[in-house]
């Protein structure tokens, strides 16, 4: 499991954020704003 997670650390975070945000706001600009700070904050948390 560790290997898989390390192999796709950003892909997993992006997928999670995109799935929850795209459904509500499919805007390309909003995606970048949300996908930017969200993954970073989650990684630090």
UniProtKB/Swiss-Prot annotation:
Sequence segments annotated as region (Disordered): 18-45
Name of the protein this chain belongs to: Putative uncharacterized protein LOC642776
Domain of life of the organism encoding this protein: Eukaryota
Taxonomy of the source species: Eukaryota, Metazoa, Chordata, Craniata, Vertebrata
């Amino acid at each position: 499991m560790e290997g898989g997670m390390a192999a796709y650390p950003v892909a997993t975070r992006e997928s999670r954020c995109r799935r929850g945000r795209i459904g509500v706001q499919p805007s390309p600009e909003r995606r970048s704003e949300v996908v930017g700070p969200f993954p970073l904050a989650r990684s630090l948390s």
